Design a protein with these regions (language model features):
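A short beta-turn/loop motif at secondary-structure boundaries
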Residues: 37-39
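Metal-associated gating/positioning segment near the N- to mid-region
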Residues: 26
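Auxiliary tRNA-acceptor-end handling modules of aminoacyl-tRNA synthetases
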Residues: 1-11, 23, 32-35, 44-242
């Protein structure tokens, strides 16, 4: 994929994020919008809402997105002076914060599709119907601006491609990756266990110790073959060392 194709895919995914936001606003009018960029694997949008999104909610939101695509809404760009921009976004506190963060004299642009308008630098596709192959994948928490002192928002992740074939190929890859997830395999093979007493720290079980020691033995063999020697250092040291 060349740079032109990558840019086109990124634009498509960015537009998919706006369609996601429009669908959420239709189904949950009280939801407040944060940001919704394209990313390397697809797109996401952050929402501030009292509703805790579930897997079933994602299915409903995706169905609404498909309706918006079928409506073939024109996506139009326009700009406004700062005062008018803030009036337009008066009910969107996160958008107001973004506007306030723009430099004086900066262009403030919006994109409109049907009843939905979002603060955005773009670019976007011309019509919603161009976003044909997409899928919502998951929902997770995300702090506003990535700062734990700010409110926790809900981030919906999705992906989009130029064709259904590409989308299906990607979704199949994700399914295969899940089958090979070390957390899944570790439990199924009895390699290790996790406990709330040490979140993120595995407790190796007998099968896991056999595998771990086999890997360590191989590691030692390779290092010895190439002339390396082994040392051992303390686990805890004074912080001034760093």
């Amino acid at each position: 994929m060349d740079q032109t194709e990558l840019n086109e895919l990124r634009t498509l995914r960015h537009s998919a994020s706006h369609i996601l936001a429009q669908a959420v606003k239709r189904l949950y009018p009280d939801a407040r919008l944060a940001i919704g960029p394209a990313i390397d694997t697809g797109f996401y949008y952050d929402f501030d809402t009292e509703t805790t999104f579930t897997t079933e909610d994602l299915e409903s939101i995706e169905a609404e997105m498909k309706k918006i695509v079928k409506e073939n809404l024109r996506i139009e760009r326009f700009t406004l002076p700062r005062d008018e921009a803030k009036k337009l976004m008066a009910d969107e506190p996160y958008k107001l914060e973004l506007i306030d963060g723009l430099e004086e004299g900066a262009e403030i642009s919006f994109y409109k599709q049907g009843e939905f308008t979002d603060l955005c630098a773009g670019p976007h596709v011309a019509y919603t119907k161009k976003v044909k192959a997409f899928k919502l994948l998951s929902v997770t928490g995300a702090y506003w601006r990535g700062d734990s002192d700010n409110k926790m928002l809900q981030r919906i992740y999705g992906t989009a491609f130029a064709s259904k074939e590409e989308l299906d190929e990607y979704l199949n890859m994700l399914e295969e990756a899940k089958k090979r997830d070390h957390r899944k395999l570790g439990k199924e093979l009895g390699l290790f266990m996790m406990t709330d007493d040490g979140p993120g720290f595995p407790f190796f079980l007998p099968n896991g110790m056999v595998l771990k020691n086999t890997l360590i033995d191989y590691w030692r063999e390779v290092h010895k073959r190439y002339g390396y020697v082994e040392i051992s250092t303390p686990v805890i040291l004074n912080r001034r060392l760093w």
